[in-house]
Amino acid sequence: MLTFQRLDVYRCAIDFVALCVPFLDGLPRGHAALADQLRRAAMSIPLNIAQAEGRTGSADKARTYAIARGSAMECAAIFDVLRTLALIDDAAHRRGNELLDRVVSMLTRLCR
């Protein structure tokens, strides 16, 4: 197992991707751009966490973690839009926000 795979923040980010994937393809016609934006932002989180762990300098690591954090914030906003448009239910919205809250909190500490 690689270092980043042992991180709780990475596992939470992977759980968030797993939460998103089932309903992305099921979004009604006309919402493809929103689905694509969420897909890219959600997948960016664990990918940037892995990339940060491969960085050698602490400033480089912090910058890459900050990018992952920005993607997590973007996902939270997209989840709010999806809920407002009634494209996801309250349970999925709540679970997504719980995971993203944990991810953002951990990434904020890693950015320091």
Language model regions located:
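Amphipathic alpha-helical assembly/interaction segments
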Residues: 1-112
